[in-house]
Design a protein with these regions (language model features):
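C-terminal and inter-domain tail/linker signature
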Residues: 1-128
Length: 128
């Protein structure tokens, strides 16, 4: 949960790396993240996103551990309004977007994370 909180609050890799393997990988079938391949890149991407949406926050809906597969999943809803600089000019529009993180562990560190997210829906709501 500490990694999730640090990542979702835009703490960047500096705030997330203690919970991850140094070479932790990342994947998502979402256009804004197509070139993001490491968890470090993703944590830094989230840091940038939070600069564009300073009111961004999440609401956890489910958090589950599958000990047999060394996997933790988190389902949440991200809400935010595009009022900050960086990326497209601020639109003042908001999104409320469902997503899931599937985090695979090696011991007590995340070795891989997959994000399941309908980015097209969120981008449309934001006017991007």
């Amino acid at each position: 949960m500490q990694f999730f909180d640090a990542c979702e609050k835009g703490k960047g890799w500096g705030g997330c790396k203690s919970y991850c393997k140094p070479d932790a990988t990342f994947s998502a079938q979402a256009e804004p993240l197509v070139e993001v391949r490491t968890l470090q890149q993703y944590a830094d991407w989230m840091q940038g996103l939070m600069k564009m949406m300073p009111d961004g926050h999440y609401d956890i809906k489910s958090f589950a551990t599958d000990a047999e597969r060394d996997t933790v999943t988190a389902y949440a809803v991200f809400s935010g309004t595009h009022t900050g600089e960086g990326g497209p000019p601020p639109t003042g529009k908001s999104t409320r977007s469902d997503y899931v993180y599937s985090m695979e562990f090696d011991g007590d560190k995340i070795r891989h994370m997959t994000k399941i997210w309908n980015s097209g829906w969120a981008l449309k709501e934001l006017g991007w």
